[in-house]
């Protein structure tokens, strides 16, 4: 909105970082593109830090092509159409105040539609209601191979916390993963990726 205010969420980036660490430990060539989070990323070889959805989209394009894309970032669907040059003051805006929004790039959909589409594309879906219905719809509409779905409530502390519980949704399979550390979730996802490629 301006140099002080922004549209964001409570996502810590921890789940994506844990997946990147796990894959790197399995000797995969990993690049982590991560948003503006306060997270220690020691040990990760290739890290690209970005501030916006547009920068993240550009970084993904520049990083490719790749064999696997794991889109765990909680990217905002919208951004202000224009950023104010100075802090917006109450005295200067009058009543009522409207914030005009425009859509951000759909990074997951763009990856799935690319000519050099990765062999495996995994998206994430954080939902507040109708988890399975919305996640299955996202799997279909985005064109990805898997969706890792988790329900976000005020009580769950999934977003920004150290634990998670998810459902891994494929076209013909759904695997419910019990609540555990995000490191544990990452290891399970990585194990399933290895199974997918090596059988």
What are the residue ranges of the model-derived segments?
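Gly/Ser/Thr-rich active-site loops/lids in small-molecule metabolic enzymes
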Residues: 8-26, 88-107, 143-149, 179, ...
């Amino acid at each position: 909105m301006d140099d002080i205010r922004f549209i964001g969420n409570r996502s810590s980036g921890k789940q994506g970082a844990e997946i990147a660490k796990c894959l790197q430990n399995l000797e995969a060539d990993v690049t982590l593109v991560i948003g503006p989070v306060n997270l220690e990323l020691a040990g990760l070889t290739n890290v690209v830090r970005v501030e916006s959805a547009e920068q993240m989209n550009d970084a993904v394009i520049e990083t490719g092509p790749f064999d696997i894309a794991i889109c765990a970032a909680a990217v905002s669907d919208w951004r202000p159409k224009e950023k104010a040059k100075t802090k917006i003051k109450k005295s200067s805006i009058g009543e009522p105040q409207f914030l005009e929004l425009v859509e951000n790039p759909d990074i997951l959909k763009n990856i799935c539609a690319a000519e050099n589409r990765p062999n495996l594309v995994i998206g994430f879906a954080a939902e507040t209601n109708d988890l399975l219905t919305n996640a299955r719809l996202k799997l279909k509409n985005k064109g990805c191979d898997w969706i890792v779905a988790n329900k976000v409530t005020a009580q769950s502390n999934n977003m920004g916390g150290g634990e998670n519980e998810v459902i891994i949704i494929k076209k013909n399979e759904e695997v419910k993963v019990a609540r555990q550390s995000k490191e544990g979730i990452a290891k399970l996802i990585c194990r399933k990726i290895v199974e997918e490629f090596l059988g």
